[in-house]
Regions:
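Extracellular/luminal domains of secretory-pathway glycoproteins
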Residues: 2-560
Length: 560
């Protein structure tokens, strides 16, 4: 038995002294994890976060220019010309409009704006405005300087309040033709006094009629006289109206009372981001590609979770916390006490922490020592595929869907609820599609890396042929001596198998001879052991029979 053990040790020593080359992959101390279709929190050497999560908390310029910040005014205050908004009346240009939640200068005379939400949307979608006079004061033969204490003792800068003059209010008939070549936004109002006395004092009669007509509209208005709850100390109201006069169209107004007449209109030009932000954020000295009500952001990532109301050149919004794409290998820690190379045990056992110049590579052992080198070709191909994957995800998700914070009046609450629900569901679909796409790509990436290692292994296996033997752990034990230059030819694909065939053949025969000798010795020892054991058993049985017959315990009768 000692002879068998000795031969086994010699055989193992003969094999382990062979020059050796292993194929493996990179392992790092990374803590990155990704999810795949079948696994969660899979450790990887490298991962790319696809979701942008930060903003600067400021109002910034965008590619379309600076925002228009209304400060104490509302949009309707600007449009109708609240005297407190005079600084805003000069020609302006903007990329988006900012309305402060605390703004108090809206409609100074109480009343309602017809289709206010549509008006705000129309005005904010333009990029600039220019005020233009529609009706000069001289066109009216009544008083046109009606004022109100609620409007700072004055009145709207874009409308004239027409009242009786010298106790009379003749029919007013005015026309204006748009020769500007652009659309003109014009505004007017109808006054509804609280009492008949107030009505007569202002317009001499109670049964007045006002008509406003263009090629597209024909509106008739009559006053609704009666007291209403006090607002700003007033029981009267003004109903505010607006329309758009297209190039070449004519506006005609006829009235015998209660008319708040157009004075100035707006030529709206260009196109902005069509957004109104209601926020207290401060203006910053910054330019961003994407703006939200929370702040600006610049990113090249395909997704963001800052705000679903982002506008500009923005990544698609998905409401999750993280979305990571695997851009490296499955991170399998190396075994620290296994194999000839210590921590390096082949791709079956784990990754190589010392492989830093590539994702896949080789380690060898020969008379010159131990060496490691990356396989740049397979690594570059894998990196190119990863880059293509990232671009592919961006391309697949680049269909823009902007959610606008729609404004609906109180009577349209159900519309608002339906709109928000639809927006939320669309966002859920985008998020699901994005997550599913990344999970699929992660699964494919990790599977491809496994295939890349196997491909590299099989490439070396084909090159070595019968000049080496596999050890089952991702390594090849060579039948011939292979110095560093020889190892390099294996790595770069120029290995000359014929050059080493004769040496390999002799070494293989030598190893096989040791195996045959050990097998013959094992057979001899087995036969010897079997015969010896049989003799011992036979002698023991004979001694037992002799003892039994001598004391009479056993008797043998022979019958003839």
């Amino acid at each position: 038995m000692e002879t068998v053990s000795l031969i086994t040790i010699l055989l193992a020593a003969t094999v382990s002294n062979a020059d050796k080359i292993c194929i493996g992959y990179q392992s790092t101390n990374s803590t990155e994890t990704v999810d795949t279709l079948t696994e969660n929190n899979v450790p990887v050497t490298h991962a790319k976060e696809l979701l942008h999560t930060e903003h600067n908390g400021m109002l910034c310029a965008t590619s379309l220019g600076q925002p228009l910040i209304l400060d104490t005014c509302t949009i309707e205050g600007l449009i109708y010309g609240n005297p407190s908004c005079d600084p805003l009346l000069e020609e302006r240009e903007w990329s988006y409009i900012v309305e402060r939640p605390s703004a108090v200068n809206g409609l100074c005379y109480p009343g309602n704006v017809e289709n206010l939400e549509e008006l705000r949307s129309l005005f904010s979608s333009a990029r600039s405005y220019q005020r233009i006079q529609i009706f000069p004061d001289t066109i009216w033969n009544v008083s046109y300087d009606g004022t109100s204490n609620t409007c700072s003792g004055s009145f709207y800068r874009n409308m004239r309040w027409l009242t009786r003059k010298n106790g009379n209010y003749p029919i007013q008939d005015a026309q204006y033709t748009n020769n500007q070549g652009k659309n003109i936004l014009f505004m007017w109002g109808i006054n509804h006094p609280p009492t008949n006395d107030t009505q007569r004092n202002l317009y001499t009669r109670t049964d007045t009629t006002t008509s406003v007509a263009t090629e597209e509209i024909n509106r008739i208005f009559k006053p609704l006289i009666g007291p209403r709850p006090l607002v700003n100390g007033l029981m009267g109201r003004i109903n505010y109206h607006w329309s758009v006069l297209k190039p070449g169209q004519t506006l005609r107004i006829k009235s015998d009372g209660n008319l708040i007449a157009p004075w100035y209109g707006y030529i709206l030009s260009g196109e902005s981001h069509r957004r109104i932000l209601r926020t207290d954020l401060k203006r910053g000295s910054c330019t961003v590609q994407c703006q939200t009500e929370k702040g600006g952001l610049n990113t090249t990532l395909p997704f963001q979770n800052v705000s679903k109301y982002a506008f500009g050149n923005c990544s698609k919004y998905i409401g999750i916390k993280s979305l990571k794409l695997a851009v490296g290998l499955r991170n399998v820690p190396s075994r620290s006490s296994r194999g000839l190379f210590g921590a390096i045990a082949g791709f079956i056992e784990g990754g190589w922490s010392g492989l830093v110049a590539g994702w896949y590579g080789f380690q060898h052992s020969n008379d010159q020592g131990v060496g490691m080198a990356a396989d740049r070709e397979s690594t570059q191909k894998a990196i190119d595929k990863i880059t293509s994957k990232v671009n592919n995800i961006v391309d697949k998700m680049n269909k823009q869907y902007e959610i606008i914070d729609h404004e609906f009046s109180e009577v349209e609450t159900r519309l608002n609820m339906i709109n928000n629900k639809i927006d939320d569901q669309i966002q859920d679909i985008w998020a699901y599609n994005a997550e599913l796409l990344v999970l699929l790509e992660n699964q494919k990436t990790l599977d491809e890396h496994d295939a890349n290692v196997n491909n590299l292994y099989n490439k070396v296996k084909r090159a070595l042929g019968s000049n080496a033997v596999e050890d089952g752990k991702g390594c090849f034990e060579l039948y011939h001596k292979c110095d560093d230059q020889c190892m390099e030819t294996i790595r770069n694909g120029t290995y000359n198998r014929r050059k080493y065939q004769e040496e390999s053949k002799l070494e293989r025969q030598k190893i096989e001879g040791v195996k045959l000798e050990s097998e013959g010795t094992y057979r001899i020892l087995t036969i010897y052991s079997t015969v010896a054991s049989s003799l011992v058993i036979a002698m023991g049985f004979a001694a037992f029979l002799f003892w039994a017959m001598s004391n009479g315990s056993c008797r043998c009768n022979i019958c003839i």
